[in-house]
Curated annotation (Swiss-Prot):
Protein name in the entry: Glucose-6-phosphate isomerase
Cellular component aspect of the GO annotation: cytosol
Catalysed reactions, as listed in the record: alpha-D-glucose 6-phosphate = beta-D-fructose 6-phosphate
Uppermost EC category: isomerase
Keyword Ribonucleoprotein: no
EC numbers: 5.3.1.9
Organism: Chlorobium chlorochromatii (strain CaD3)
Assigned keywords, A-Z: Cytoplasm, Gluconeogenesis, Glycolysis, Isomerase
Keyword presence, Cytoplasm: yes
GO terms (BP aspect): gluconeogenesis; glucose 6-phosphate metabolic process; glycolytic process
The encoding gene: pgi
Major place of residence: cytoplasm
Length: 548
């Protein structure tokens, strides 16, 4: 297949970028009073304002031409139909099937996927109801008060983010904790707060062999048995989300408390599956269903809306515009809601593990940029940390601003202040402040000519910095589900345009392989000598401190 950069659509965008580069957004707004209406979308309690981008109507036409030339709609349909679009692992990509209503039949290769999903959801619901009601008791007859999810990557980031985001919707009968890092500090600090008599552990590992997860699970098991003593009690305090029945049973978990999921669910898309058990326990199962319903609603929008009014497609193509035609290498996500403080970290895995690829689907090294670096922190904290670089740095960094219109905590004028900061930042990034404006300000403040000359270059803001603003009527289980699915589909569209496989993650493997080599060397009786001089020296410095 010819490189994307050789296509007519790509070349047209390259030429257009040269034409549009000198344009200032403040000029575009001044010339078009309907610019916001022209470049914004409303959908089910969500507003996407993309008018503060370096685009014209012609830009969007050309970007959508590129999307069509990449056959976005055919690729989308292939994913939704369960075709094995994960080519390197020969797997379907069906996380969207997890959130379909049970009344919607769905089969792949003769397998009734809808029935399989319904069966696991029913198992999850039954378990959640028993835990929440207090029917499920531990080895001393006490009900559970704390849930500890032990997982890593997609088995941690998604559930952790969702439970933090939806904390106001929790039923309040259970505390939830997450342990992911193999650093013993993470587990130790968590266990200090807990009573083994009232703690339930969820061990989330598809293979039940993941090093970090199994190390933490075994240490949690040992901690539990210090009090419970009898290994038979493990079945009352540990459940598993896995497909490895033999390993689960060997650990001491009752097979009836193993919640399965499927190869067609990638880790970073797995919160909708039984990996979301901690979410369902913390919120209650009805709220978990609302989360699924919100994601399904976005799936339907993605599948049915024309490209011109398709929110995931628009956001994806704007990302392509900056990555491939402006040379931008990173993208900031700024949620103006403290409950979404883990959302940027969740998106890091979703986006960077999906689209951080250097070869096309047929194995050819790409000759264009692919995945961007995703990063961010909540506003207004971020304004006092890294917004200096966004406003006056040498890099153009597109940013998404996310704000729920309704707050869950209406304290005084706090939410008004939060919203005013959000809107002000997008305006400031777009407009900037010219030399003339700075000079007028300084003159009005009584500055003399020398002071003005000295300060002027430091106080100029170039502006023309692009942002998308997403307004949610409210952050709740439904809208959060929609928001997550919006970004999932954005990432998918970009992967198709870049002609890469967004659903494998071979880059995770090499470091794990080498760690398995180095681990016994750390514990060996002699110094390491089999690596490069740097790695040998680091291993030996560790050994000298820990073992010598």
């Amino acid at each position: 297949m010819a490189s994307r950069v050789e296509s007519a659509a790509w070349r047209a965008l390259q030429a257009h970028q040269q034409e549009i580069a000198p344009l200032q957004m403040r000029q575009l707004f001044a010339e078009d009073s309907a610019r916001f209406e022209r470049f914004s979308l409303r959908w089910q309690g969500m507003l996407c304002d993309y008018s503060k981008h370096r685009i014209t109507a012609r830009t969007m036409e050309l970007l959508l031409d590129l999307a069509r030339s990449a056959e976005i709609e055919a690729a989308r349909n292939a994913m939704m139909q369960g075709q094995p679009i994960n080519l390197t692992e020969k797997r379907a990509v069906l996380h969207t099937a997890l959130r379909k209503p049970q009344s919607v039949p769905f089969a792949v290769d003769g397998q009734n996927v809808a029935a399989d999903v319904a069966e696991v959801l029913a198992q999850m619901e039954g378990c959640c109801n028993r835990i929440i009601s207090g029917e499920w008791v531990g080895y001393t007859g006490k009900a559970m008060t704390d849930i500890v999810n032990i997982g890593i990557g997609g088995s941690d980031l998604g559930p952790y983010m969702v439970t933090e985001a939806l904390r106001p919707f929790a039923h309040g009968k259970l505390n939830v904790h997450f342990v992911s890092n193999v650093d013993g500090t993470h587990l130790s600090e968590t266990l200090k707060k807990l009573n083994p008599e009232t703690t339930l552990f969820i061990v989330a590992s598809k293979t039940f062999t993941t090093q970090e997860t199994l190390s933490n699970a075994m240490s949690a098991r040992a901690w539990f048995l210090q009090c419970a003593v009898d290994a038979a009690h493990i079945a009352k305090h540990f459940v598993a989300v896995s497909t490895n029945r033999a390993k689960v049973v060997e650990f001491g978990i009752d097979e009836a408390n193993m919640f399965r999921f499927w190869d067609w669910v990638g880790g970073r898309y797995s919160l909708w599956s039984s990996i979301g058990l901690s979410i369902a326990m913390y919120l209650g199962f009805e709220k978990f269903r609302q989360l699924l319903a919100g994601a399904y609603a976005m799936d339907e929008h993605f599948c049915s809306a024309p490209l011109e009014s398709n929110m995931p497609v628009i956001m994806a193509m704007l990302g392509i515009w900056y990555s491939n035609f402006f040379g931008c290498t990173s993208h900031a996500v700024i949620p103006y809601d403290q409950y979404l403080h883990r959302f940027p970290a969740y998106l890091q895995q979703l986006d960077m593990e999906s689209n951080g690829k250097r070869v096309t689907r047929d194995g050819t090294v790409v000759d264009y940029a692919t995945g961007a670096v995703i990063w961010g922190e909540p506003g207004t904290n971020s304004q006092h940390a890294f917004f200096q670089l966004l406003h006056q740095g040498t890099q153009i960094i597109p940013a998404d601003f996310i704000l729920p219109l309704k707050t869950q905590n209406p304290i005084g004028a706090h939410h008004d202040m939060l919203a005013s900061n959000c809107f002000a930042q997008t305006e400031a990034l777009m407009k900037g402040k010219s030399e003339e404006e700075v000079e007028r300000e300084l003159v009005a403040a009584g500055a003399d000519a020398a002071t003005i000359a000295a300060l002027l270059p430091h106080k100029v803001f170039p502006g023309n910095r692009p942002t998308t603003t997403l307004l949610l009527d409210e952050l709740n289980p439904f809208t959060l589900g929609s928001l997550i699915a919006l970004y999932e589909h954005k990432v998918f569209v970009q992967g198709i345009v870049w002609n890469i496989n967004s659903f494998d993650q071979w880059g995770v493997e090499l470091g794990k392989q080498l760690a398995n080599v180095i681990l016994p060397e750390l514990q060996a009786s002699s110094n390491a000598a089999a690596h490069d001089s740097s790695t040998n020296a680091l291993i030996n410095a560790y050994r000298a401190q820990r073992y010598c």
